[in-house]
């Protein structure tokens, strides 16, 4: 019987059919000599075995097969509760705990990350749709994180994403990654190829969740394919306040000097180049830098857009610049939204103008003409979801919610990173 828990450094771990593309790609990067955090991959068979032990297989089938929507929601809730509340079977828990103990014995804190079999694939990246758990302090927290990652396959957000991509959660499974925590001083993401043929790097101080969730406007560095730094734009950070309903929801402060020096930027550029060669296509990466240097955390396929030629009628109108998602051109009526509770105001064909571009906004990508956000960067999770759907998006646009009138006609160039509106 194949091992359920395999070190990422072993050849066996590069099998996406067992460990998911996220874990398999990470294993391939490390085995090719690129710096990664190391760790273990947990076979999706562990999830399937747990499901069978809990008697949840028929319940799983009912989520998408039931025509009764309340019953389908009940099935989904039963899946989440069953996976969260019931203990992990001992024969599954023991090899995972062995990996956890090895991490703790090294003096590091542990991390549990999702690696679903449908995740990080062309056309279904699932960016920000599942869960990762950091800084796990004891075995109880570790096993809770394992159960929560399994249950995340049945979250409302993940199920909504699957429904719009023609996927059924009952037909897939959740593999896992168990890793030591990278104590990030700086973290971010990168695109190995833009529509202009360049490489793009985002960076911010501290762990990468703020960039992924679109909560900061990160540093932006653009390199040509020879590795020459063409652009360097410092980021901005905001301090969040509660839902403001029309008032400014965030106060702004400048982040100061840039997060990476020229040598570190060049190093990341070379890492992205090698990752692209290994994956066989342009990639989007996530990375973190601790006291020992830069480590790659993830590499997923990247959809690259084509340069757009704007209609000349728009060139005479006011413009704002920001970080392009890298794909698309669209026009529509601006709908300025100050918090997620106002999303019901966004109608099909509107351009959503907001402050924070978090992955929870993924639900509107099915029907909007574009997205403009004051925070976020080209490597945020929502930008990744927008690229996947071909929705133009511009992030890190200062004062967009104040400058762009609600109801005005807006043009969004997701390749050039330009937003224009008619007065």
Where are these regions (language model features)?
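N-terminal beta-alpha lobe that positions the nucleotide/phosphoryl donor
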Residues: 1-177, 185-186, 263, 327-339, ...
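Structured core elements
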Residues: 7, 28, 111-113, 125, ...
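Terminal amphipathic helices with adjacent charged low-complexity linkers/tails
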Residues: 42-59, 225, 241-242, 277-316, ...
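Acidic, glycine-rich flexible loop/linker segments
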Residues: 57, 211, 301-306, 329-346, ...
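Short, flexible loop/turn elements at secondary-structure junctions
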Residues: 116, 180-182, 205, 289-291
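Extended active-site and interfacial segments that coordinate phosphate-rich ligands
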Residues: 127-157, 183-242, 299-324, 370-372, ...
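Conserved catalytic alpha/beta cores of large enzymes that bind or transform nucleotide phosphates
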Residues: 203-284, 289-290
């Amino acid at each position: 019987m194949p091992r359920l828990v395999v070190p990422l450094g072993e050849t066996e771990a590069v099998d996406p059919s067992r460990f998911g593309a996220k874990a398999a790609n990470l294993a391939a990067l490390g085995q090719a000599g690129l710096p990664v955090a190391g760790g273990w991959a947990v076979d999706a068979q562990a999830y399937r075995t747990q499901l069978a032990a809990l008697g949840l297989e028929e319940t799983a089938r009912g989520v998408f097969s039931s025509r009764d929507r309340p019953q389908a929601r009940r099935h989904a809730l039963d899946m989440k509760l069953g996976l969260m509340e019931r203990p992990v079977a001992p024969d599954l828990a023991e090899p995972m705990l062995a990996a956890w103990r090895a991490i703790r014995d090294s003096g590091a804190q542990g991390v549990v990350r999702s690696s679903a079999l449908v995740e990080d694939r062309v056309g279904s990246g699932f960016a920000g749709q599942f869960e990762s758990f950091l800084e796990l302090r004891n075995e109880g927290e570790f096993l809770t994180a394992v159960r929560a990652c399994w249950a995340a396959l049945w979250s409302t957000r993940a199920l909504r994403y699957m429904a719009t991509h023609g996927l059924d959660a009952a037909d897939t499974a959740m593999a896992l990654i168990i890793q030591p925590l990278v104590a990030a001083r700086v973290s971010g993401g990168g695109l190995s190829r833009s529509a202009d043929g360049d490489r793009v790097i985002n960076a911010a101080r501290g762990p990468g969740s703020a960039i992924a969730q679109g909560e900061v406007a990160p540093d932006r560095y653009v390199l040509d394919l020879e590795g020459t730094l063409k652009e360097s734009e410092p980021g901005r950070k905001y301090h969040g306040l509660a839902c403001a309903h029309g008032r400014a929801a965030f106060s702004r402060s400048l982040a100061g000097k840039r997060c990476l020096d020229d040598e570190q930027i060049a190093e990341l550029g070379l890492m992205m180049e090698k990752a692209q060669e290994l994956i066989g296509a342009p990639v989007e990466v996530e990375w973190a830098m601790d006291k020992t240097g830069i480590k790659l955390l993830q590499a997923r396929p990247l959809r690259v857009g084509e340069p757009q030629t704007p209609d000349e009628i728009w060139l005479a109108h006011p413009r704002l610049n920001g970080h392009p998602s890298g794909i698309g051109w669209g026009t529509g009526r601006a709908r300025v939204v100050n918090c997620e509770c106002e999303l019901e105001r966004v109608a099909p064909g509107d351009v959503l103008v907001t402050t924070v571009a978090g992955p929870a906004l993924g639900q509107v990508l099915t029907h909007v003409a574009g997205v403009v956000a004051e925070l976020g960067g080209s490597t945020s999770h929502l930008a990744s979801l927008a690229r996947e759907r071909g929705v133009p998006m511009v992030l890190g646009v200062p004062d967009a919610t104040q400058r762009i009138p609600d109801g005005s006609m807006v043009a969004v160039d997701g390749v050039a990173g330009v937003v224009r509106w008619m007065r």
